[in-house]
């Protein structure tokens, strides 16, 4: 496999926004995409896509496990020896209760997957990204994790985990600022995915108007992916540490 290609690793590339990223990137000339799935055998749509796109390679990865992240990185290292763009898109979203009524297991599961998970991927893939030409690391975050643009719905564990992820991104951007890296978080917008629909249904009990807003304004995953890629394609060194919206504007922390 040629190392002159631009190499992308998409953690969580098996469905929704991640799969849309994989599809758009794999249609680009000179691009190789490694897409992770926790259970590759169950990622049927990604499997089908890879059969018709020889530049797509599926990697097993459970981001909650540092061992799994290290194994995934070793597999990519053997194949291509570098990563130009590391995009951590994996995460969970099933926390819709008040802080008062959110149990420990919900807090713990969101922190483990949405914060420690991306940290595991970063720790495992850092040497590969350092060898890449672009040296870009992207964390898919959420407006819900912004305290400056507070989202007025009960998000408890999810919102807290995304705020922690944004802090982690900012810390990494500071640590790598002298190594030529560009590290950002990005909000994909309100996207028509299964997890987003579940969240809307939960919040509709208290605010029924959200159903109409979601129906009219939610982006298709392909549109969100396309918009975010425009942002990432045009990143400059001075963007290191930014929290972007999918449309290229910035979001306060």
UniProtKB/Swiss-Prot annotation:
Cross-referenced Gene3D superfamilies: NAD(P)-binding Rossmann-like Domain
List of residues binding NADP(+): 17, 36, 62, 89, 158, 162, 191, 193
Cellular localization per UniProt: Cytoplasm; Nucleus
Lineage: superkingdom: Eukaryota
GO molecular function, one term: oxidoreductase activity
An annotated GO cellular component: cytoplasm
Keywords: Cytoplasm, NADP, Nucleus, Oxidoreductase
UniProt-listed InterPro entries: Fungal_SecMetab_SDRs, NAD(P)-bd_dom_sf, SDR_fam
EC id: 1.-.-.-
Annotated active site: 158, 162
One of the GO biological process terms: cellular detoxification of aldehyde
Family: Belongs to the short-chain dehydrogenases/reductases (SDR) family.
Protein name: Uncharacterized oxidoreductase C663.06c
Natural source organism: Schizosaccharomyces pombe (strain 972 / ATCC 24843) (Fission yeast)
Source species taxonomy: Eukaryota, Fungi, Dikarya, Ascomycota, Taphrinomycotina
């Amino acid at each position: 496999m040629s190392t002159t290609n631009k190499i992308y690793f998409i953690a969580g590339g098996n469905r929704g926004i991640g799969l849309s990223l994989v599809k758009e990137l794999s249609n680009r000339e000179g691009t190789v995409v490694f897409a992770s799935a926790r259970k590759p055998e169950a990622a049927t749509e990604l499997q089908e896509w890879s059969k018709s796109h020889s530049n797509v390679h599926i990697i097993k990865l459970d981001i909650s496990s540092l061992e799994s992240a290290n194994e995934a990185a070793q597999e990519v290292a053997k194949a291509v020896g570098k990563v130009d763009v590391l995009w951590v898109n994996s995460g969970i979203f099933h926390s819709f209760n008040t802080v008062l009524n959110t149990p420990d297991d919900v807090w713990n599961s969101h922190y483990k997957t949405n914060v420690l998970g991306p940290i595991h991927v970063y720790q495992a893939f850092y040497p590969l990204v350092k060898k890449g030409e672009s040296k870009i690391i992207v964390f898919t975050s959420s407006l819900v994790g912004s305290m400056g643009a507070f989202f007025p719905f009960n998000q408890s564990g999810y919102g807290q985990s995304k705020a922690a992820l944004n802090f982690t991104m900012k810390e990494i951007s500071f640590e790598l600022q002298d190594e030529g890296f560009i590290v950002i978080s990005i909000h994909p917008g309100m996207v028509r995915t299964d997890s987003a629909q579940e969240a809307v249904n939960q919040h509709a009990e208290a605010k029924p108007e959200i159903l109409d807003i979601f129906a009219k304004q939610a982006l298709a995953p392909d549109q969100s992916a396309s918009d975010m890629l425009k942002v990432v394609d045009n990143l400059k060194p001075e963007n290191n540490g930014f929290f972007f919206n999918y449309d290229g504007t910035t979001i306060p922390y």
